[in-house]
């Protein structure tokens, strides 16, 4: 006997008669409503840029965290429900710390992406007290890092998939941003060119005027092997270069 559509809507572990998990689809839609996130990989490193939505003049923009460090050499940008992202990132940090403790070496970026994706699939699992989440995680992460293989950029999503990209956009402006990246990205571009492309892409898809307070930028380079969230002075300088290009 098949469940009704309404029952399928609420059943997190039950496929519909069409082979769909509606709760995962709803979580994916929540992800698409999140802040626009851009990630670009180059030979020199990876850049992440994300829109920070400041909904009120009384809101302190610096309190909004959309880019979070996972380990010294890895970080992630968040699109979707930030509270859900904290659970995933806290787990990823624990994986990175355990790996460093056991093997005395930094964790591989792909291993972190897989650990996050594995946790994404554990909704509705176990007893009520031990359950990680009673529903799918409504968040996508762009994970940037540098390991022994070089710069890496992965996306994870609510379905538990993780895929590596050269350049990727996610969130509310995905279609327009991805189209721009597809047109302008090339594998030989420098990290600085990638920084400018990331911010100029955000500029074209954001509803608000781009400034140093409503975007966040992070870099991880092959040279330093350190994930760094950049300050407002860096962002203002980058915005200035974008304006010069448009003149």
UniProtKB/Swiss-Prot annotation:
The proteasome is a multicatalytic proteinase complex which is characterized by its ability to cleave peptides with Arg, Phe, Tyr, Leu, and Glu adjacent to the leaving group at neutral or slightly basic pH. The proteasome has an ATP-dependent proteolytic activity. GO terms for biological process: proteasome-mediated ubiquitin-dependent protein catabolic process. It is found in: Cytoplasm; Nucleus. Belongs to the peptidase T1A family. Gene3D superfamilies: Glutamine Phosphoribosylpyrophosphate, subunit 1, domain 1. One of its GO terms (cellular component) is cytoplasm. It comes from Entamoeba histolytica (strain ATCC 30459 / HM-1:IMSS / ABRM). Transmembrane segments: none annotated. Its main location: cytoplasm. This is Proteasome subunit alpha type-5. The 26S proteasome consists of a 20S proteasome core and two 19S regulatory subunits. The 20S proteasome core is composed of 28 subunits that are arranged in four stacked rings, resulting in a barrel-shaped structure. The two end rings are each formed by seven alpha subunits, and the two central rings are each formed by seven beta subunits. The catalytic chamber with the active sites is on the inside of the barrel. NCBIfam families: PRK03996.1. Keywords: Cytoplasm, Nucleus, Proteasome. InterPro entries: Ntn_hydrolases_N, Proteasome_alpha, Proteasome_alpha-type, Proteasome_alpha_type_5, Proteasome_asu_N, Proteasome_sua/b.
């Amino acid at each position: 006997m098949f469940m009704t559509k309404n029952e399928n809507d609420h059943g997190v572990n039950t496929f519909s008669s069409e082979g769909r998990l509606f709760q995962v689809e709803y979580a994916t839609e929540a992800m698409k409503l999140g802040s626009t996130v851009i990630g670009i990989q180059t030979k020199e490193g990876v850049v992440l840029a994300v829109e920070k939505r400041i909904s009120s003049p009384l809101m302190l923009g610096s309190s909004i965290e959309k880019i979070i460090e996972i380990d010294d050499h890895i970080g992630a940008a968040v699109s979707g429900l930030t509270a859900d992202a904290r659970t995933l990132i806290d787990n990823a940090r624990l994986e990175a710390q355990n790996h460093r403790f056991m093997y005395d070496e930094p964790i591989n970026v792909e291993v972190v992406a897989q650990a996050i994706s594995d946790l994404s699939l554990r909704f509705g699992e176990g007893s009520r007290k031990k359950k990680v989440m009673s529903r799918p995680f409504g968040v996508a992460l762009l994970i940037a890092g540098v390991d022994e293989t070089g710069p890496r950029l992965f996306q994870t999503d609510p379905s538990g998939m993780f895929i590596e990209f050269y350049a990727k956009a996610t969130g509310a402006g995905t279609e327009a941003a991805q189209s721009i990246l597809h047109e302008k990205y090339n594998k030989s571009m420098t990290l600085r060119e990638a920084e400018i492309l990331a911010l100029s892409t955000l500029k074209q898809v954001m509803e608000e005027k781009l400034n140093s307070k409503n975007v966040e930028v992070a870099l991880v380079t092959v040279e330093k092997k350190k994930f760094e969230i950049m300050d407002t002075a860096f962002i203002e300088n980058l915005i200035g270069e974008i304006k010069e290009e448009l003149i």
